[in-house]
């Protein structure tokens, strides 16, 4: 590939830096530059191109804000109608339906550009009422990160940056970005100890802020959740009465309130969703005929709304007749499927006890460690039904929240689940192995001269902004592949799904955005040479690449792009808007378009959002010592991210009900950021000072102690379920206050697919307020017995607007 005029100065800069750093002609260092010689990344320009990238990214951010304001004013119904429609579908959303007009009133009170001022005027109490506890914990986590970065920004800019500028290893050019990095200090400079000390301080600061955040996480444990056990490993032919009799005989002091077996209802869920859509469409055209006195003809083919003439195969038919026929067919299929489901138990059960202490006692009996000779786990208390129920094979845990359970995924278990998991993740590995990082994608594009016309312009504005924009775009695309692969794994709870997503997306992002580009592995040919060619002199570890003068500028530009372009795109929710547009185009009729509007609201994906934010936070912390100028831009990113998330949580997404473990998982991964900073500093000391230098030994000791502490914490976290103390519970004041109340059994259990209770004879109300949510079977038939249906004052207006 012919080198472009823009890249001609690169070799001379490489020679200059090698001489100044005293690295000589070592192949590792030349590799770092050669790998980027014909690439659009890691370019050496004035101050790393940061001023240019900052100006263009801010301009793009303002443009995205303008576009969002227009879309919100003209097309915001695609989000609002869905939120109003979802409001009355489930008990946990009834706080929305009770004040669904309050959101509109709140915006009207704010005057001009209400969504922008709402970000600053929203109180946590409003967000708690509207979005739930998980949103509060998520925003609290962001606030702790903000305060942490404020402190680190002050220390990095007021202490570390002046120390780096005091060196003269890279000259006195005020436009040189390298002067702000640790590479500007001489190896015999005692001020290098300051960096080591501050890296330890940053570690303790992070631990302190995260500990404070963890203490603030308080969940209102719903008594029904702590009273219910989830049991797997039951024989599929086990009956409800047999399970109840076993607990009555084995644990005479524990009273069973209810036992619910689980069935394979994935297909039933799909059929019921289609039926509700059909019934709504039928009601839409029935009301339209009553209003106009004319019957409506439709073309029931995909994109049929765009057919303006009748040809063979695209004939029009009466809308009421079409949807009546579809509804009758679906009702027949639902009836047949319902009777078939009763013969397909899954070998799982939810068992609810009268008191929490009873469930705790039984859980301790099944899961507590009982070392008896060579047996680590003893048998639970037996009964006359133990052999029939195969009690020794049971796995018993506390049940998750009813809203957290993905009922349709319960049928995927055992070998089938593991084979599906292995297949999905193997395919993911194969795809991502060849597209490991955005840098590799971009360097591969360079091989085909994709970016050659950009270089031919010899315009530093375009040549610096274009790579940064591409880097962010691919950084947003590749995690989406990981995200959707996690959804395909069919986890049984949303909490488990989000928890896996946090770890999976975070680890992948760290490798593709931070570690591999930092080591200079930015093209496929060099990546494979490093991976497989053990005879080449260029295959040793490229730790020198981490500390090249322009390396930090590459990540500063990435953080700037994430702050402005990333936040603007999250506010715009472009993927959701594209999906909405596609579904509206594919809709067959006006009634189908109305259904699309009512099904456009989604729950907030805390797992993916945690992972994305923690990736950028880790990049910031990893370079906070070696490249201190990155920290204030990281603070800007977290501030913008916090404001955008406050808006989206309140105005754009449905509330989610998750377990608190996902928030603790995010805290654990946040603690990895300062540890990576210590690793970076140790590599620098090892390369520049040698292994026997006091600063290197001290950093190495701190790294070892930190790793040891992490291992002990992880092992304790993994094995604490073996301890009976893990199940010790404390009664709340309300529990202690009324003994009589504690003995009142719950009127019903939500751990049951409501579809199975008289679905064939049930007729769903067809108003927009009766729209189902996502996955929980009880949602399909509306509210539970004994629960009032909250009336939505804005429902009529929304319905009228949809029909217009």
Swiss-Prot record:
Residues 218-413 are annotated as: Intracellular linker IL2. Keywords: Calcium, Cell membrane, Endosome, Glycoprotein, Ion channel, Ion transport, Lysosome, Membrane, Phosphoprotein, Transmembrane, Transmembrane helix, Transport. It comes from the Eukaryota. Its main location: membrane. GO terms for biological process: lysosome organization; surfactant secretion. Monomer. Glycans are attached at residues 38, 449. Residues 554-585 are annotated as: Gating helix. It is found in: Lysosome membrane; Early endosome membrane; Cell membrane. One of its GO terms (molecular function) is calcium-activated cation channel activity. Disruption phenotype: Mice are all viable from the neonatal to late adult stages. Double knockout of Tmem63a and Tmem63b results in lethality at birth due to impaired alveolar expansion and respiratory failure. The modification Phosphoserine is found at residue 738. It is a multi-pass membrane protein. The chain crosses the membrane at residues 52-74, 134-166, 191-216, 416-443, 462-489, 495-531, 554-585, 606-623, 628-650, 661-688, 694-708. Disulfide bonds: none annotated. This is Mechanosensitive cation channel TMEM63A. Belongs to the CSC1 (TC 1.A.17) family. The keyword Ion transport applies. Residues 1-51, 167-190, 444-461, 532-553, 624-627, 689-693 are extracellular. N-Glycosylated. InterPro entries: Csc1-like, CSC1/OSCA1-like_7TM, CSC1/OSCA1-like_cyt, Csc1/OSCA1-like_N, Nucleotide-bd_a/b_plait_sf, RBD_domain_sf. Residues 75-133, 217-415, 490-494, 586-605, 651-660, 709-804 are cytoplasmic. GO terms for cellular component: centriolar satellite; early endosome membrane; lysosomal membrane; plasma membrane. Mechanosensitive cation channel with low conductance and high activation threshold. In contrast to TMEM63B, does not show phospholipid scramblase activity. Acts as a regulator of lysosomal morphology by mediating lysosomal mechanosensitivity. Important for the baby's first breath and respiration throughout life. Upon lung inflation conducts cation currents in alveolar type 1 and 2 cells triggering lamellar body exocytosis and surfactant secretion into airspace. Also acts as an osmosensitive cation channel preferentially activated by hypotonic stress. The gene is Tmem63a.
């Amino acid at each position: 590939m012919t080198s472009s005029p823009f890249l001609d100065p690169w070799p001379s800069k490489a020679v200059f830096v090698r001489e100044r750093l005293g690295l000589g002609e070592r192949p590792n260092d030349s590799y770092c530059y050669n790998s980027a010689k014909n690439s659009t990344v890691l370019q050496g320009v004035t101050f790393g191109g940061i001023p240019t990238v900052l100006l263009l990214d801010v301009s793009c951010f303002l443009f995205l804000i303008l576009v969002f304001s227009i879309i919100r004013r003209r097309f915001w119904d695609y989000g609002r109608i869905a939120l109003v429609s979802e409001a009355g579908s489930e008990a946990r959303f009834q706080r929305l339906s009770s004040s669904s007009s309050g959101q509109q009133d709140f915006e009207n009170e704010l005057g001009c550009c209400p969504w922008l001022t709402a970000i600053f005027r929203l109180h946590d109490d409003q967000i708690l009422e509207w979005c739930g506890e998980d949103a509060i914990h998520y925003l609290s986590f962001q606030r702790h990160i903000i305060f942490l970065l404020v402190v680190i920004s002050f220390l990095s800019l007021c202490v570390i940056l002046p120390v780096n500028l005091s060196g003269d290893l890279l000259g006195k050019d005020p436009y040189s970005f390298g002067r702000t990095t640790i590479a500007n200090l001489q190896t015999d400079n005692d001020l290098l100890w300051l960096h080591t000390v501050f890296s330890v301080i940053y570690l303790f600061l992070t631990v302190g802020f995260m500990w404070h955040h963890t203490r603030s996480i308080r969940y209102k444990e719903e008594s029904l959740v702590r009273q219910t056990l989830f049991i797997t490993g039951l024989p599929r032919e086990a009956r409800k009465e047999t399970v109840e009799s076993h607990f009555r005989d084995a644990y005479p002091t524990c009273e069973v309130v209810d036992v619910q077996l689980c069935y394979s209802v994935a297909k039933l869920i799909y059929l019921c969703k289609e039926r509700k859509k059909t019934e709504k469409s039928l009601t839409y055209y029935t009301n339209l005929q009553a209003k106009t006195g004319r019957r409506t003809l439709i073309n029931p083919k995909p994109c049929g709304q765009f057919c303006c003439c009748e040809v063979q195969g695209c004939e029009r038919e009466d809308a009421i007749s079409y949807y009546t026929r579809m509804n009758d067919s679906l009702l027949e299929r639902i009836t047949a499927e319902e009777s078939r489901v009763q013969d397909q138990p899954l070998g799982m059960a939810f068992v609810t006890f009268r008191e929490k202490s009873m469930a705790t006692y039984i859980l301790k009996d099944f899961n507590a460690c009982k070392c008896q000779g060579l047996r680590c786990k003893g048998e639970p208390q037996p009964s006359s039904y133990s052999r029939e129920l195969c009690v020794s094979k049971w796995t018993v845990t506390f049940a998750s929240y009813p809203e957290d359970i993905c009922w349709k995924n319960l049928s995927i278990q055992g070998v089938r689940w593991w084979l599906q998991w292995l297949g999905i993740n193997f395919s993911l590995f194969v795809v991502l192995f060849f597209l490991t990082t955005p840098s590799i994608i971009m360097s591969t594009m360079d091989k085909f001269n994709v970016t050659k016309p950009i270089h031919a312009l010899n315009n530093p504005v375009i040549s610096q902004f274009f790579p940064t924009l591409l880097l962010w775009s691919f950084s947003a695309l590749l995690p989406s592949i990981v995200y959707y692969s996690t959804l395909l794994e069919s986890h049984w709870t949303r909490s488990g799904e989000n928890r896996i997503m946090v770890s999976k997306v975070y680890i992948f992002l760290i490798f593709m955005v931070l570690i591999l580009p930092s080591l200079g592995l930015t093209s496929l040919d060099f990546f494979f040479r490093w991976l497989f060619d053990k005879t080449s002199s260029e295959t040793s570890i490229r730790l020198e690449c981490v500390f090249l003068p322009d390396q930090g500028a590459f990540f500063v530009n990435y953080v700037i792009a994430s702050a402005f372009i990333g936040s603007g795109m999250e506010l715009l929710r472009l993927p959701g808007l594209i999906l909405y547009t596609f579904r509206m185009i594919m809709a067959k009729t006006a009634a189908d378009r109305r259904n699309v509007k009512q099904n456009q609201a989604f729950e907030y994906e805390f797992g993916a959002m945690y992972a994305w934010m923690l990736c950028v936070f880790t990049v910031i912390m990893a370079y906070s010592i070696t490249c201190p100028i990155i920290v204030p831009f990281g603070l800007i990113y977290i501030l913008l991210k916090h404001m955008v998330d406050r808006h989206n949580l309140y105005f754009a997404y449905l509330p989610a009900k998750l377990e608190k473990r996902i928030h603790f998982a995010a805290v654990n991964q946040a603690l990895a950021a300062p540890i990576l900073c210590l690793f970076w500093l140790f590599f620098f000391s090892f390369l520049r000072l040698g292994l026997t230098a006091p600063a290197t030994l001290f950093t190495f000791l701190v790294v070892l102690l930190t790793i040891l502490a992490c291992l002990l914490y992880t092992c304790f976290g993994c094995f604490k379920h073996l301890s009976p103390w893990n199940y010790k519970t404390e009664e709340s004041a309300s529990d202690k206050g009324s003994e009589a109340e504690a003995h009142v059994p719950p009127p019903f259990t939500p751990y049951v697919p409501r579809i199975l209770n008289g679905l064939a004879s049930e007729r769903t109300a067809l108003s927009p307020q009766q729209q189902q949510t996502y996955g929980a079977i009880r949602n399909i038939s509306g509210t539970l017995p004994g629960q009032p249906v909250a009336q939505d004052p804005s429902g009529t207006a929304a319905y009228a607007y949809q029909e217009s």
